[in-house]
Amino acid sequence: IQRVYDQCIQVKDADVFIATDSEEIKTSCTNFTENILLTRKNHPSATDRIAEALEQLGHYESVINVQADEPFVDPKLISNLFKALESKEVQMVSAMKKIHSVKDLHNPNVVKVVTDMQNNALYFSRACIPALLDEENKKITNEELKHSSQSYFKHLGIYGFKRTFLA
């Protein structure tokens, strides 16, 4: 958690808070920050926890949810998500990254995302979508992926919301 926190505090003009339902995590995090919010335990998702945290804080108009399993999150990515939320048309943002390895493409732990032409997410899957096979229905190689006309993207577990979206 501290590594994620340390990455997040590098974002200029951003206040960083840890939202948790665990007294144990709260106590542990007091070693490096006082910005800890204790939330209810019964949230069905992290987004619900973020909504409660934003309600507790009261005065922020947008929030970026960086989960604790992202110790190498790029502070520039967080800044870019905040920047995207400045648009009046944008209520919620997330991030994706091009997949360059067949191993990642077929790894069910890597969530894939399909987007429309404006990069709006259409759907997510742990499977390779659309399916990528050669003419004989065999998985392709990294070199073939590199030269494929189809781009594949992995979803990054980071989300940004406007307060009004979470209300």
Language-model segments: which ranges?
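Conserved core of the sugar-phosphate nucleotidyltransferase
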Residues: 73-167
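N-terminal glycine-rich phosphate-binding loop and ensuing alpha1 helix
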Residues: 1-20
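Short phosphate-binding loop-to-helix
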Residues: 17, 23-83
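Short, high-confidence coil segments that cap the C-terminus of an alpha-helix
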Residues: 13, 59-60, 87-91
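Hydrophobic/aromatic residues located in beta-strands of well-ordered beta-sheets
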Residues: 16-18, 63, 93, 121
